[in-house]
Amino acid sequence: SKHALGMAIDINPLMNPYVREDGYFPKNATEYLERDITLCKGEHKDKMIHKKDMAYKIFKRNGFLWGGDWEDCKDYQHFYMK
């Protein structure tokens, strides 16, 4: 896997869940499905990754792609290199 090769990383899965049309994971991430940080009710919403977030900027600047940009599903925790 890309994770085992050091070419992918998942950050704060609870605050940055994997979301598909038929559900999301982890199951206790319900309050973080709202991705607008001003509307999110999660206690740790400051740990959510979004395009203005420092983690997003650093990873993108270093050539990583983000699962939050995927079309079919969203993997907000996932950064990876092609």
Predicted features along the sequence, with ranges:
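Active-site-adjacent substructure of cysteine-protease-like catalytic cores
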Residues: 1-6
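Catalytic cores and adjacent binding grooves of peptidoglycan-active enzymes
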Residues: 7-9, 13-82
